Amino acid sequence: MILRLIAITGFLALVAVVSGCKCPSGGCVPRTPCVPCVLEPAEVDGQPPDLAALTCADCELIPLPAPKETYQLLSANTCQCSAATNAPVANMVELEHHWARVVIECDTNAVRENYCLDRDLMALHAVGIRNDSASAALKAFYQLAGLEAQEHFLQLATDETGRTLDRIDNLRERAITIPDGIDYGTVESRLHELKDQQLQLEFLRIQLNGQLQKLIGCPLDETTFYWPQVDWQVDLTPVDVEGALALGLATRGDLRGLELMICKIDKVTLPVARAVLAYADGTLGSVEPRDGLIHLARCFHCNKSELPIRCRQLAMLYSDTENLAIAEIKSAAYKIVLQQQRAANTQQTVEKLRGRVEELTKTRDVEDVAIFEISKARGDLYQVESKLIEQVVALEVAKVDLRKTQGTLALECGFDPKLCCEGCRARGRAGSLR
């Protein structure tokens, strides 16, 4: 009976091996789409098209969406923390973090140790994503604030240039000689350039509002416009570069994650170590012991060499990441120093031009100052006023960049991960593993 059962089992196994899967799609490799490169030769005259004649002159153009009488007020703190909270990828990582917790509660100790470490790394990664989202939102916030402020001075410059053009037309109609240095074509070109800048600002306003709506988790609506509430006081407080560096090295998620991995690496957590190394470079962690009794028996002693290799790799990765972090934080800090100096220089230029316009206006009747000279001085002032706003916005963006490189934007909104594996001092151990 037993022999008959063995024979039947062997026969069925043989039939399965011989017959196998038909696999009808595996017989040949299909052809891929291909279009031959056959183009018609021709001689061309090289003359550019007359676009002025080809453009429709009486077509009705659709205006860009523009703000109505009311805006929606938006503060920097609301913008920052809403973007950090509503970051979709970070929230998906949070769900993965929860699933790891579920597995930890019901599986073996080895699996529990791996997933506990993996869960902590996911928590740090989620905070990093929230940090990046808050940074992107704050940059768009300050850029939008600068745009709204610059639009005011751009409108003043446009009106002033239009009045200059009207004065030239008036002098022509009255057959009065136009003062030297005043060219109608130059002024008209300047007016068209200013109007084109206004159109570009209107489009950029739509883009920045849409970007903010996406980042802070609001419905996308091109007819809804935000008004950023910004304190325009120029902050020229000296930057403590070393203090900023010390804070950043203590709070950056990438360094905390590597410290955690170096602290907890052992034979059980080698799979997590391979994944961390692969995140830095695809070839790292790609070589791992094969499964199976034969491989285990033949490579039992060789497999012991993996742990010190992974420790050395993690120590080298930590050193490289730390050096990169130092460079990023210091660069961001000195960018603030640069923007402070640029804003201060532009502020001085604004004060000088304001004094110049005021002086010309007061002495207009006494010294017979031409109105065209006053108009030009006003135009120069409006241009530098707009430049000052640009410099102040760049200063605020530089401050955001520093907080981003320090990894503090999400922490400021309360996203401080509580790690179950953190505790040992990895920096000293990282040095000893090199």
Question: What is the role of each PLM region?
Answer:
Residues 1-5:
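Positively charged n-region of N-terminal signal peptides that target proteins for export
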Residues 6-17:
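Bacterial N-terminal signal peptides
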Residues 20-47, 63-66, 318, 385-434:
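Acidic, low-complexity, intrinsically disordered peripheral segments
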Residues 22-155, 161-162, 168, 175-185, ...:
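Short flexible linkers and secondary-structure junctions
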Residues 72-74, 237-239, 354-356:
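Short hydrophobic/aromatic segments of transmembrane alpha-helices and their interfaces
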Residues 78, 90-105, 129, 135-154, ...:
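Amphipathic alpha-helical coiled-coil segments
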Residues 83, 181-184, 188, 218-308, ...:
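Amphipathic alpha-helical coiled-coil scaffold segments and their short linker/junction regions
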Residues 108-111, 126-251, 261, 332-339, ...:
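Periplasmic alpha-helical coiled-coil/stalk elements that build and connect Gram-negative outer-membrane
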